[in-house]
Structures are given as structure tokens and as C-alpha cells.
UniProtKB/Swiss-Prot annotation:
Species of provenance: Buchnera aphidicola subsp. Acyrthosiphon pisum (strain APS) (Acyrthosiphon pisum symbiotic bacterium)
Primary role: Binds the lower part of the 30S subunit head. Binds mRNA in the 70S ribosome, positioning it for translation.
Protein name: Small ribosomal subunit protein uS3
GO MF term (any one): structural constituent of ribosome
GO CC, any one term: cytosolic small ribosomal subunit
Length: 233
């Protein structure tokens, strides 16, 4: 029986970048890794309603730089940047080093697998029919320019006694093509019947030229709190 490899892990260093960008000695590596995990867990819990896509952590010269990709930058930044400052102080306590926080806006949340899977799980928890939630997400992604999308849900669908899985796909999703830019995410919906797993694959097109092309295209619209306030005015 064939198994599917993780689409993001398979493409790391080819067309995908790491979420933690730092190098450490053997004695410091475990501490840095544990620190990164705690920072991510803290941010995902604190910013649960801010539609967080991913968190990039860099460690330049005894400090830490955290870039938060979100569909709702206003919620993260808060009034006059108050919330960002609270986050900075909390992360500094966790890591024990000076912290810089950057906010990057996700322009098209319909094409972000993490945000799509979170959207479907929230609908399932609100008792929306799973087929309707899947179809709506697929149609929104295709409307925004996705080359293909596949959504799979598994568990006690509709409260059935026997767990099963169903999937819905539009367009093409070439999992074996390494140059294919496929965004993948998994989420869990906690319903009264039990846990329902949601997997999302989104094919955005092919990237030719490897990591050089990715570096050139993936320069984020990172905003400090001052820039955000200036742009908002």
C-alpha cells in the first residue's frame, strides 16, 4: 500500500525554506530547538484568532528575530502597537535574549494551506456540513488562481458510527514533481463526535531555478509597527 511523503519536508532546500533559520553548536542545539518550539506554541495559543499562517525564527548574534505571517496583521499589532510589545516581552522571557518581531501580511489567505485547513476545522466545529465546507474552500482557492487543490477529511463524518475519509479535488496536484510549489497543512477539528482530521494540498504552479528563484520571489512585505501605522493612515 503506497504512502504519501510530507510535501513540505520533501521539498526543503529545493523550493521550500526552513521555518527556523539558524546554526548552533552541538551543546546549544537542543536548547535552541526547545526554545523555538515554546515560542511557536505560545504564539499560536495567544494569537489563535489572528489567522497565523507560519512563524519564521532567526537567531542573529545572540538575539532572536520572529517573523509572523498572518492574514490579520491588525489583530497581532493591536492599538498603537501595544500587543506587539507585549508579545516581544513575553518571548524575551521564554528565550532569554533580545527579541525583534516583524509582521508579514498574507495577501491571499484562500491560497494558504494552513489558513484553509483552519477555516475548515472551525466550520466543522460550528457543525457546518463537511462536504459544504470542503467545496467552499476548494472553489475559493480556484477562484483566487490556484492550479489545483485537494482537501481530505477523516473521522466520524456527520456523526457516523464508523470513521471514514472523504476527499475532494479540483485541478491538478502533482505530489511527485519536486519543482511543483505545493503548500500542505493538517488541522484537527474537535467535535462532539470526536476528532476530525483535515488535510489540504494547494498547487500554486511550478518554480524553475530552485532556491535562488524562491529567495527572489519570497521577499516578504515585512512591516514594523511604525510602518504599519504609517500605511494605515
Amino acid at each position: 500500500m503506497g504512502q504519501k511523503v510530507h510535501p513540505n519536508g520533501m521539498r526543503l532546500g529545493i523550493i521550500k525554506k526552513w521555518n527556523s533559520v539558524w546554526f548552533a553548536n552541538t551543546k546549544d542545539f537542543a536548547d535552541h530547538l526547545d526554545s523555538d518550539y515554546k515560542v511557536r506554541q505560545f504564539l499560536m495559543k495567544t494569537l489563535e484568532k489572528a489567522s497565523i499562517s507560519r512563524i519564521i525564527i532567526e537567531r542573529p548574534a545572540k538575539s532572536i528575530r520572529v517573523t509572523i505571517y498572518t492574514a490579520r496583521p491588525g489583530i497581532v499589532i493591536g492599538k498603537k502597537g501595544e500587543d506587539v510589545e507585549k508579545l516581544r516581552i513575553s518571548i524575551a522571557k521564554i528565550t532569554g535574549v533580545p527579541v525583534q518581531i516583524n509582521i508579514s501580511e498574507v495577501r491571499k489567505p484562500e491560497l494558504d494551506a494552513k489558513l484553509v485547513s483552519d477555516s475548515i476545522t472551525s466550520q466543522l466545529e460550528r457543525r457546518v456540513m463537511f462536504r459544504r465546507a470542503m467545496k467552499r474552500s476548494v472553489q475559493n482557492a480556484m477562484r483566487q488562481g490556484a492550479k489545483g487543490i485537494k482537501v481530505e477529511v477523516s473521522g466520524r463524518l456527520g456523526g457516523a458510527e464508523i470513521a471514514r475519509r472523504e476527499w475532494y479535488r479540483e485541478g491538478r496536484v502533482p505530489l511527485h514533481t519536486l519543482r511543483a510549489n505545493i503548500d500542505y497543512s493538517i488541522s484537527e477539528a474537535h467535535t462532539t463526535y470526536g476528532v476530525i482530521g483535515v488535510k489540504v494540498w494547494i498547487f500554486k504552479g511550478e518554480i524553475l531555478g530552485g532556491m535562488e528563484t524562491v529567495e527572489r520571489l519570497d521577499k516578504p512585505s515585512v512591516q514594523t509597527k511604525k510602518q504599519y501605522r504609517k500605511n494605515r493612515k
